[in-house]
């Protein structure tokens, strides 16, 4: 079935993204996987190509294009190429909306140009060793101080530890979720922008993950970091609400990526099943394998229609948190099932990282964990049903 949600402009953009990936990412990705981190050069190249901050004002170097579908195209093509190293998805879809919604004019002047050019790589620090899905369990603290101090004015003294932070080694600016009022529950959570060279901000090791080896993921430590009050994003105490407002987009974006991974793994496996022979015939001709491929094709087609509808609803500002949770749950779990079946259909070759399906299997497993686990998605959906 032909997709109905894109225009010729989106199609042209897709061609450009594919060319960018072929030139700037694919030739280097294996080395990045060995290094455990990408080169900053790819971020600068993405900035020059107009792939960062597509929705932000052109005067800051953005694309001036608020259409979310351009990000859908970018994320789909990165997923299909197995380009897990450059975390443009995080930069554009998870951090960009916070900046666009919360930054003051002065903050825009300070951060937006570098954000769009790739000179300022961004991260967001929510998860702590003792607080994952339960954001109200955040223990990092930011205590407001008046005058004096190293920054010479009103500031927050930030203390705490974060973990599993994507872009953690490379990040120049980090949105830190911290508790500014210990007695106010979720109304005591605020967002602070921590910059690379602030004293007391240190990074732990680059974590050794099961997959996504080219993506730097780190622990971050904050010890009496003096963050200027001018680096508060939005209002003090407004952090939790801001986080909740962006979750539907984050979850649809993860679903978009997961479904694209599943589609590519299926396409690779279908081609392999037609050319790989056993017992005198292509392995896809065996009834069990044929049925397995038929099931995957159907499940992916159904998910594609559902996800494209959610993209359309999001673009119209009509996608609910419950519906976004459905997309995230369904697409990520489908991706897990599809990549696992595809590895099985490849036999021993599927277990080799030199085969794309093997990398997809390990790289994509986290999709049903980050951004809210499958179990949390079901909780959200259940509550939406009045249960």
Show where each model-derived region lies:
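Alpha-helical interface subdomain recognition
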Residues: 1-85, 102-107, 114-119, 135, ...
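Short glycine/proline-enriched turns and hinge-like loops at secondary-structure junctions
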Residues: 65-66, 134-136, 167-171, 185-188, ...
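Short Gly/Pro-enriched turn/cap motifs at secondary-structure boundaries
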Residues: 88, 115, 130-133, 164-167, ...
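Helix-loop "lid/cap" segments that line or gate small-molecule binding pockets
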Residues: 94-102
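A short, Trp-centered hydrophobic/proline-enriched beta-strand micro-motif
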Residues: 118-126
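Flexible, small-/acidic-enriched active-site or ligand-binding loops
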Residues: 137, 197-228
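A structural signal for short hydrophobic beta-strand segments in well-ordered beta-sheet cores
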Residues: 140-143, 149
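A short core secondary-structure module
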Residues: 154-155, 159-203
């Amino acid at each position: 079935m032909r997709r109905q949600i894109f225009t010729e402009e989106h199609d042209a953009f897709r061609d450009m993204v594919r060319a960018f990936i072929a030139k700037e990412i694919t030739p280097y990705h294996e080395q990045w996987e060995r290094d455990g981190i990408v080169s900053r050069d790819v971020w600068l190249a993405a900035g020059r190509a107009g792939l960062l901050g597509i929705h932000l004002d052109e005067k800051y170097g953005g694309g001036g294009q608020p259409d979310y579908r351009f990000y859908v195209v970018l994320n789909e093509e990165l997923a299909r190429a197995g380009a897990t190293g450059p975390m443009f998805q995080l930069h554009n879809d998870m951090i960009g909306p916070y900046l666009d919604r919360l930054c003051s004019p002065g903050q825009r002047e300070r951060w937006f140009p570098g954000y769009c050019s790739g000179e300022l790589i961004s991260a967001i620090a929510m998860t702590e060793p003792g607080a994952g899905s339960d954001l109200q369990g955040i223990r990092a603290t930011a205590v407001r101080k008046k005058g004096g101090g190293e920054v010479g004015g009103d500031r927050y003294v930030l203390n705490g530890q974060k973990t599993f932070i994507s872009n953690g080694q490379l990040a120049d600016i980090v949105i830190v979720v911290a508790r500014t009022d210990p007695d106010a529950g979720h109304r005591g959570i605020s967002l602070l922008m921590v910059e690379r060279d602030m004293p007391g901000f240190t990074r732990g090791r680059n974590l050794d993950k099961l997959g996504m080896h080219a993506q730097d993921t780190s622990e971050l430590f904050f010890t009496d970091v003096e963050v200027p009050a001018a680096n508060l994003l939005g209002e003090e105490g407004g952090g939790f609400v801001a986080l909740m407002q962006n979750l539907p987009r984050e979850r649809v974006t993860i679903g978009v990526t997961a479904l694209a991974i599943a589609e590519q793994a299926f396409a690779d496996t279908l081609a392999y099943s037609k050319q790989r022979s056993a017992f005198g015939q292509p392995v896809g001709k065996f009834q069990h394998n044929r049925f397995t491929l038929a099931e995957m094709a159907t499940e992916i087609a159904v998910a594609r229609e559902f996800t494209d509808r959610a993209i359309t609803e999001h673009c119209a500002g009509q996608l609910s948190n419950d519906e976004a949770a459905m997309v995230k749950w369904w697409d990520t779990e489908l991706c897990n099932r599809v990549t696992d079946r595809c590895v099985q259909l490849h036999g021993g070759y599927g277990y080799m990282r030199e085969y794309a399906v093997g990398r997809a299997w390990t790289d994509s497993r986290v999709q049903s964990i980050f951004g809210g686990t499958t179990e949390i998605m079901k909780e959200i959906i259940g509550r939406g049903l009045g249960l």
